[in-house]
């Protein structure tokens, strides 16, 4: 007996040692089922709060069901009754729901991508305060939001609020504390006192209390009997132990602190149900019909072992033979865990029951098809290919080819695939291809094709690509050429050294650029669509006409000139003379234009100089002498005569 008492005292000393994380004190505790919840006040970050719970053997609290949310609300209500009035009207208390840095929001899940720090399976229960922000760049933590201006009612459970997790010294806005959770194998009933006394429980998570509804396994109880007189005080020490599977008690027999002075009048003698007094002041505990007295001689238990609901979660209690024992049974899709009291989900997808994709769900599973497949109908396979190229469904601009589980797009000749998803078609500009223009002279790009053309005085060869010198006439043709002229025109050839090879400019217009002539394309030149209608060169040489444009066609080979050798020589001489005559007319026209320009320029210079002289003359400054003029000079004798000659008829 002394050895047992020594071990109990040693256990009490170990349990009462102060733990790490003393930045917050346990203010309230609620134990129910197989878990205890503790509420703490203190402005700590989420990491500091988790460290405090963890060093005492627990984690920040989980809230996986409405029932568990009510337990957490009860312990917070106890804390608020003991705590002084908080300054903030809206207060927050950390719980164990967090999302790590780099993990993004998932709106399709009840927990939105968050997870419980204590582990375990996610449940569909959630109680978010508002829509969450999609942020992946920092760690986010969840707290319970309490409106202290309103009473805590079971119908108004605390909302979940997510935000930054805080740091030491800066826990976050309105953070007032946190809630811890500690899980146990089972619970003992509170010790019953049959007389005056006090019981103090010390839990494994270093909480002391005298008013626990259930006492967790491995807790110690210190019972002090008496009414306060030290001479009459007696102490008893007990430990909550597991007597049998899922059976926990203190190992005591009968009520504690019993006194003949009170009998059954004090706390019903400490009996669970009935108390029967003897004639000498003693009493005994009894049970009602359908119940039996347990070994502690105080507690009553139903004769039906399932009446105490030993099975947890979704497990159902099933009586054994003669009703003396029981087993727990799980619904379909679940199986018993290692304790044989609770149920866990069966992962049916491990057996690969689906043709393609299997998604495990609580209590079951569902089959899904890969992208590009859809569920088949009756009599068809589980998943069948989706024909993306079907009428009205094709995503391609032109050609669409369906494949098993996918598709690919194609374009007609003259187009290439374009767009981010490769479903659009873009025209190929053959006139600016990497190999240079396909035409010898002018090139015109069209949607899906191109056309070739020639400068005035040149005609498109039968291959639709090269240009040959056209016939030259001194005057406009009087009528359509006869068959012989046509033959000569088609058969004439002109050797080319360095000619102007026009190509398409950046605006899509033909642009002539000097290039070295090259031989005409062979008979395997590309064949293009219908030619663009344009006027053939006609009229006097040296005058610009609309280029002769034809579409490139396949030529059967080099054409033989009609007639014999003499015909070929004649045609060559005619072509040379025509070319010289054309050059003569061009040079003459250029010289005439230059002479006219020189004459106009000389006339313009002359008129400008004359205008300047007149303007200078008009602006010449005047002086005083300009107002006088010289008198005509007379002979001196004539003047003397006029002055001294006597007047006629006088002596003077």
Swiss-Prot record:
Signal peptide limits: 1-21
Effect of residue 104 to S: Loss of interaction with MMRN2
Location in or out of the cell: Cell membrane
Modification Phosphoserine, positions: 627
Keyword Cell membrane: yes
Post-translational modification: N- and O-glycosylated. Phosphorylated on Tyr-628 and Tyr-644 by SRC; these phosphorylations promote endothelial cell adhesion and migration.
Biased composition (Polar residues): 512-526, 640-652
Domain (EGF-like) ranges: 260-301, 302-344, 345-384, 385-426, 427-468
Modified residues (Phosphotyrosine): 628, 644
Tissue note: Highly expressed in endothelial cells, platelets, cells of myeloid origin, such as monocytes and neutrophils. Not expressed in cells of lymphoid origin.
Biological processes per GO annotation: angiogenesis; cell-cell adhesion; macrophage activation; phagocytosis
Residues of the C-type lectin domain: 32-174
Annotated Gene Ontology cellular component terms: cell surface; ficolin-1-rich granule membrane; plasma membrane; secretory granule membrane; specific granule membrane; tertiary granule membrane
GO MF annotation terms: calcium ion binding; carbohydrate binding; complement component C1q complex binding; signaling receptor activity
Subunit record text: Homodimer. Interacts with C1QBP; the association may represent a cell surface C1q receptor. Interacts with surfactant protein A/SFTPA1. Interacts with multimerin-2/MMRN2. Interacts with DAG1; this interaction plays an important role in endothelial cell migration. Interacts with CBL. Interacts with IGFBP7. Interacts with VEGFR2. (Microbial infection) Interacts with hepatitis virus C/HCV core protein.
Function as written in the Swiss-Prot or TrEMBL entry: Cell surface receptor that plays a role in various physiological processes including inflammation, phagocytosis, and cell adhesion. Plays a role in phagocytosis and enhances the uptake of apoptotic cells and immune complexes by acting as a receptor for defense collagens including surfactant protein A/SFTPA1, C1q, and mannose-binding lectin (MBL2). Plays a role in the regulation of endothelial cell function and adhesion by activating angiogenesis.
Protein name: Complement component C1q receptor
Organism: Homo sapiens
